[in-house]
A protein has these predicted regions:
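Mature catalytic core of soluble alpha/beta enzymes
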Residues: 3-9, 15-389
Length: 389
């Protein structure tokens, strides 16, 4: 059966993974090459960039390493440091911070001695839960941006998203019997998504869900927010040149100190091209320093029902996967904002989506339309290779 998307005007889908498409990642480290099966993402670090003056390359060497066990994705760090020992020290710190933040923001698993987002969900309607300040800050951040952007991305939509998660898991494990969630179940769950019932007591560091049937799902923001925390801490610790790639999020620290490039090149993956991420199958390249890029797309987590691809980005207005675009990419300073906005813009019709992006200072965006056309804000065009950057 031919696979078609929810939008009748969309092209047929090429075979895709979970938004984390398999490829062989070859990481060059000083004196050795490590080959790993890793996960490709919508954004790809590229070798191409503007050429600058040489000089720093004599002082800095390139190192990289990856994490496979946090935030359900591959996290890769590429950095230029004076020595491998210094890189290893920075990476060890980043690894521990990502693991701690993963445990705090996890909605599926318990950890001994930790009250996390799952703990909050487990106590919905029962009592406030005392949590780490980093959970308080994440939820305040998400509520603030929810209100600033019209309420499309709602961390209180856990009841609805859990239904989709369960049906997607079942559909992926047993494709022949994959089903749509019943709309009556989704509408019943929708009654329990009022973000105002997420009661945050910042002074006492507690969170209480006033509706016993509601739950939090921070998947649209947690990974980017955690990436921003780690990037800022590493810059403060003296890391001058690095890129952190976490799923569909990329955060650059400084510029590449290789004596060749003045900016990092980030490729926007073509959803319908080869699963091997290289410069031959990207839609475009954007160039950044000290900035973040995030993408949300319909080719990430999904399953198929009767030939229809059902991805994981659910429109709160319809309770169904949004079908305005193939992907949306956002560039801004803060990785958490980029992560949040890439989802929000994906959930809005183009004119509203573009108007929102243009109303926010320091935010640029690109939209991959169902027919493959790429539209972009003027500021995004200024840093896109196809536009002469």
């Amino acid at each position: 059966m031919a696979i078609q998307r929810l939008s009748n005007s969309a092209p047929a889908l090429a075979p895709k993974g979970t938004g984390l498409l398999e490829y062989q990642l070859v990481m060059q480290m000083k004196g050795r090459t490590v080959k790993r099966i890793a996960a490709a993402v919508a954004l790809i670090l590229l070798a191409s960039a503007l050429v600058g003056c040489r000089g720093m390359s004599d002082k800095y060497s390139k190192y990289s390493d990856s994490l496979f066990d946090v935030f359900n994705t591959l996290i890769t760090v590429v950095a230029y440091t004076p020595s491998e020992k210094e890189f290893d020290s920075h990476f060890a710190t980043m690894r521990e911070r990502f693991r701690k933040l993963h445990q705090l923001y996890d909605i599926y698993n318990d950890y001994q001695g930790i009250n996390n987002v799952k703990t909050i969900n487990d106590h919905a309607g029962v009592q406030p839960v005392k949590v780490d300040r980093e959970i308080i800050d994440l939820l305040l951040f998400a509520k603030d941006w929810y209100r600033r952007t019209g309420g499309k991305t709602n961390v209180a939509m856990g009841a609805v998203l859990q239904i989709w998660h369960d049906y997607r898991e079942q559909g992926q494990s047993d494709p022949e019997n994959a089903k749509l969630p019943p709309m009556e179940d989704l509408r019943e769950a929708e009654k329990h998504t009022d973000i105002d019932k997420v009661i945050i007591d910042a002074e006492n560091s507690t969170v209480y869900l006033a509706d016993p049937e509601m739950s939090l799902d921070v998947g649209a923001v947690a990974k980017g927010y955690a990436t921003e925390i780690v990037a800022r801490e590493m810059a403060e610790a003296g890391l001058k040149s690095a890129v952190i790639s976490s799923g569909g999020n990329i955060r650059a620290i400084g510029k590449p100190l290789d004596g060749v490039r003045e900016r990092w090149g980030v490729g926007i993956q073509n959803p319908d091209e080869s699963i091997v991420p290289d410069e031959q199958n990207v839609l475009d390249v954007i160039f950044i320093n000290d900035a973040s890029v995030a993408s949300s797309g319909d080719y990430m987590r999904y399953y198929v029902v009767n030939g229809r691809v059902l991805h994981h980005i659910i429109d709160p207005a319809t309770l169904m996967p949004a079908d305005y675009y193939r992907a949306v990419t956002v560039m801004t300073a803060h990785a958490g904002v980029a992560d949040f906005l890439s989802t929000t813009l994906f959930l809005l019709p183009y004119e509203q989506s573009r108007a929102l992006a243009q109303s926010l200072d320091g935010v640029e965006a690109a939209w991959v339309m169902p027919d493959g056309e790429v539209k972009a804000t003027d500021g995004m065009k200024a840093i896109m290779r196809s536009q002469g950057a």
